[in-house]
Amino acid sequence: MAPKAEKKPSEKAPKADKKITKEGGSERKKKTKKSTETYKIYLFKVLKQVHPDIGISGKAMGIMNSFINDTFEKIALESSRLARYNKKPTITSREIQTAVRLVLPGELAKHAVSEGTKAVTKFTSS
């Protein structure tokens, strides 16, 4: 039998030293918080306009935030579908208005359309 070859320990390059700051701690990148946009402050403002003496729990606020996100997503999906049907590359206020009429029920759709029209008019006039 042939003698086994001796294994040499693989030589690794020495690890780079950590940079030391003036305070003596190691220099690390700070983790930045991922900002999540919510409608919580706006929901709270509307609640105080309608019922100034009533509060809302954090869980209920989270549910309302999810509801608004879901509704906006439905409107965006429907308006993009309408633009595709009409072979238009752009979603205009007309597609949004029609999508709102399709997504929201009855009287709520009428109020949403009138408030949206009012907001667009105010935006274009300023």
Curated annotation (Swiss-Prot):
Subcellular location: Nucleus; Chromosome
GO cellular component: a single term: nucleosome
Site of covalent link Glycyl lysine isopeptide (Lys-Gly) (interchain with G-Cter in ubiquitin): 122
Keyword field contains Acetylation: yes
Sites of N6-methyllysine modification: 4
Basic and acidic residues biased stretches: 1-27
GO molecular function: DNA binding; protein heterodimerization activity; structural constituent of chromatin
PTM (free text): Can be acetylated to form H2BK6ac, H2BK33ac and H2BK34ac.
This protein's record includes keyword Ubl conjugation: yes
Positions carrying N,N,N-trimethylalanine: 2
Modified residues (N6-acetyllysine): 7, 12, 18-19
Official protein name in the record: Histone H2B.5
